[in-house]
Design a protein with these regions (language model features):
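Membrane-water interface segments at the C-terminal ends of transmembrane alpha-helices
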Residues: 2-35, 51-163, 191-212, 216, ...
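A short amphipathic helical element positioned immediately N-terminal to and/or at the very start
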Residues: 41-51, 184, 330-340
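Polytopic alpha-helical membrane proteins, predominantly small-molecule transporters/carriers
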Residues: 59, 177-178
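Feature of multi-pass inner-membrane transport and sensor proteins
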Residues: 166-167, 182, 219-227, 231, ...
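Short alpha-helical segment that forms part of, or immediately flanks, the ligand-binding pocket
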Residues: 170, 452-453
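The alpha-helix within a helix-turn-helix
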Residues: 173-174, 455
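Short, charged juxtamembrane terminal tails flanking transmembrane helices
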Residues: 175, 544-551
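Glycine-rich helix-loop "coupling/hinge" segments at transmembrane-helix boundaries
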Residues: 212-238, 324-328, 493-520
C-alpha cells in the first residue's frame, strides 16, 4: 500500500512539474484564446507566425549557431579528450578541473566578460592596441563564445569513454601488424563514436536553448535566436502568449529531435571493450610530444578560462570603466557594496540560495523515488515515470518558463503560485530533475541485484529496504547530484527573468540588471562570488562521486 502511495505521489509530482506545463503550451498554441477561456479559432495563431518575416531568421539563426557550436566543440573537445584519455599526462586531474570551469561559468557572464575584453576600448585594446570588436559581434563570434562554454561536454564524453574502455583492443591490433594510425582509425575511433555522438548532440542541445549569449551579443551581430524571440513575445507589449507558445513548441521540437537522434545513435550502437575484471588504464607515453600537447591544452584553457576570468576580476576591481586598467583605478568598493545592507545584493543572494536549497532537496527526493521505482521496483507505468523524469533534459529553460506561465496564469485556479517565488521553485525543479535521476540511476546499476531481495526475504518492507539498504549505498551519488542542482539553480537566468515576482531578484537577475543599468563593476563582483561558490560545490560533488565509485 505504501509503495502504491509513493508511486502515486511521484507520478502526481511529475505531472505537475513536467506534463501539465507542456500540455498548456500545446493548448495555447492550438487555441489562441485559450488564456481567456475560449476554445474557438483553433490553429488561428499558426498562419500569423508562419507569415512573420522574422521566423526564418530566428530558426535559421538558431540552427546555424547551434550547428556551429556543435562542430566547433568537436574540433576542440575531441583532440583534447583523446590526449587526456589515451596518453599519460602530468597532473591529469588539473586538466579536468580546468576544463570543468567553463561549463560551470554561467554563459551570460562569459559573454559579458568577453565583451568587456574584446570590444572597442576594451581591455585588449587598452593593453595591446588591438581590438576584435567586429569578430565578437558576429555569428562567428557568438559561436566561439558559446563554444568555449560548451566544448567540455565533448571533452569529458571522449576522455571518459577512452579511460573506461582502455586500449587493449588497439594494442591487439598493433600486435597483429596494424600501424598506430590504422589501429586508431579502425579500432579506437569506432569504439569512441557513441560517446562522441552523444557529446556533439548534447552540445547542439545546449546551444539551441542558450539565452544569455545571444541576448548579450546577438542584437549587435544581427542574430536573433528562438530563445530571444520567445522572451521578447512575453516581455514586449502587447504580450503574445500564442506566439510564445508556438515558438516554444518549435524550439522543443528541435531539442527533442536532437535528443531522439542522440538516443538512437547511442542506443543502437553497443560496444563491449571490457569483459571480466578490468585492467588499469595507464595511458601511453607521448615522449617528446608531451610538451606540445600540454601547450595546446594550456592554450585552450587560457582562452576558455583565463580571458573571461581576468576580464571578470578586472571589472570587479576597477573603480570605473572609463578609468582604464591602472593601479589608481583599483578598488574593493564593488565587493563591499555587495554586503551593504541598504542594497539589493544580499537580498538577491538570499533568495537564490534559498531557492537553490529548496530545489536540491525536492528534486533529490523526487529523483531518488523515480529512479528506485523504475529500476528496482519496476512498477507498472514505469515507462511514463522514466520519460517524465528525464524529459526536462531536452526542454530549454525558456520553454519551461512559458509552460508555467500558461499553466498558472489561469482564472479557474482558486489559488495560484503565479507571481510568487513558488514559480521559480517549480521551474528550477522541472529543469534540474534529470540530474538526480541520472546520478542515482547510475549508482543503482552498480548495486548487486540481490541486496534488496535479501532484505525482503528477511522480512523488510520495500520502504524499509530503501531506507536501510539502498539509500546508504546511493547517498554519495545522490548528494553529488543535489550539490550540482544547488550550483546550477543558484545562477539560472532565463526562467528567473521570466518568472521573478515584481520587486524580487535572484543572483542571475541582479547581475543582468546591473549590466542593464550600467553598474558593471558590482555585477561582476557578484559574478565572481557566484563562480567561486559554484566551483567549491562542484569540487565537493566530484569528490563525492569519486568516493561513490571507489565504494
Amino acid at each position: 500500500m505504501k509503495q502504491k502511495f509513493l508511486s502515486g505521489v511521484t507520478l502526481a509530482a511529475l505531472t505537475l512539474l513536467v506534463a501539465l506545463p507542456l500540455l498548456f503550451i500545446l493548448l495555447q498554441a492550438i487555441f489562441p484564446h485559450f488564456s481567456a477561456g475560449s476554445l474557438h479559432d483553433a490553429f488561428g495563431g499558426v498562419w500569423p507566425l508562419l507569415a512573420d518575416p522574422q521566423l526564418p531568421s530566428m530558426l535559421g539563426g538558431t540552427l546555424w549557431i547551434a550547428g556551429g557550436v556543435a562542430m566547433a566543440s568537436v574540433m576542440i573537445g575531441l583532440p583534447l579528450g583523446i590526449l587526456r584519455g589515451m596518453f599519460s599526462l602530468p597532473l591529469p586531474w588539473l586538466w579536468d578541473l580546468l576544463f570543468l570551469i567553463p561549463f560551470l561559468t554561467p554563459p551570460y557572464i562569459s559573454a559579458l566578460s568577453w565583451m568587456l575584453a574584446l570590444q572597442s576600448q576594451g581591455y585588449l585594446q587598452q593593453l595591446t592596441g588591438w581590438q576584435l570588436n567586429d569578430l565578437l559581434f558576429s555569428r562567428s563570434g557568438i559561436v566561439l563564445v558559446m563554444t568555449f562554454n560548451i566544448f567540455p561536454v565533448v571533452y569529458f564524453a571522449v576522455s571518459r569513454s577512452l579511460l573506461a574502455s582502455g586500449q587493449r583492443l588497439a594494442m591487439v591490433a598493433r600486435v597483429h601488424g596494424a600501424s598506430a594510425w590504422r589501429a586508431f582509425w579502425h579500432v579506437t575511433l569506432p569504439m569512441l563514436s557513441p560517446a562522441l555522438a552523444a557529446g556533439m548532440l548534447l552540445a547542439f542541445t545546449l546551444a539551441i536553448e542558450e539565452f544569455g549569449v545571444p541576448a548579450a551579443l546577438g542584437s549587435r551581430a544581427g542574430v536573433v535566436m528562438l530563445t530571444v524571440g520567445i522572451e521578447k513575445k512575453l516581455a514586449d507589449w502587447p504580450v503574445d502568449l500564442t506566439g510564445a507558445a508556438l515558438l516554444s513548441l518549435l524550439l522543443m521540437a528541435v531539442a527533442l529531435f536532437a535528443w531522439w537522434l542522440q538516443t538512437r545513435l547511442v542506443g543502437e550502437k553497443e560496444v563491449t571493450s571490457v569483459t571480466g575484471k578490468p585492467g588499469e588504464n595507464r595511458g601511453a607515453s607521448l615522449g617528446w610530444m608531451t610538451l606540445p600537447a600540454l601547450l595546446v591544452m594550456a592554450a585552450v584553457g587560457g582562452l576558455a578560462v583565463g580571458v573571461p576570468a581576468v576580464s571578470m576580476m578586472l571589472t570587479s576591481l576597477m573603480g570605473t570603466l572609463s578609468g582604464g586598467v591602472s593601479l589608481e583605478n583599483v578598488t574593493l568598493r564593488h565587493f563591499a557594496a555587495l554586503f551593504d545592507q541598504q542594497g539589493d545584493a544580499l537580498s538577491a543572494l538570499g533568495v537564490s540560495l534559498s531557492l537553490a536549497l529548496g530545489s536540491a532537496l525536492i528534486v533529490g527526493a523526487l529523483g531518488l523515488l523515480a529512479a528506485w521505482l523504475v529500476m528496482v521496483q519496476k512498477i507498472k507505468g514505469r515507462g511514463v515515470v522514466d520519460a517524465l523524469s528525464l524529459m526536462p533534459a531536452a526542454l530549454p529553460g525558456v520553454v519551461v518558463g512559458v509552460g508555467l506561465i500558461l499553466l498558472w496564469n489561469q482564472p479557474f485556479w482558486p489559488r495560484s503560485p503565479y507571481n510568487t517565488l513558488w514559480m521559480l521553485l517549480l521551474s528550477y525543479c522541472c529543469l534540474l530533475l534529470p540530474w538526480p535521476v541520472r546520478y542515482v540511476g547510475s549508482a543503482l546499476r552498480q548495486l548487486g541485484p540481490n541486496l534488496e531481495p535479501a532484505a525482503r526475504v528477511h522480512g523488510a518492507s520495500p520502504l524499509r529496504a530503501l531506507r536501510l539498504i539502498v539509500l546508504p549505498l546511493v547517498f554519495p551519488a545522490l548528494l553529488a547530484a543535489m550539490l550540482m542542482v544547488f550550483a546550477v539553480a543558484s545562477r539560472e537566468l532565463v526562467t528567473s527573468l521570466l518568472l521573478s515576482p515584481a520587486g524580487t531578484q535572484t543572483v542571475a537577475v541582479f547581475i543582468w540588471r546591473q549590466f542593464e543599468q550600467g553598474s558593471v563593476g558590482q555585477g561582476m563582483a557578484m559574478a565572481s562570488l557566484t563562480l567561486l561558490t559554484g566551483l567549491v560545490l562542484m569540487l565537493t560533488a566530484l569528490a563525492l562521486m569519486q568516493r561513490s565509485t571507489r565504494g
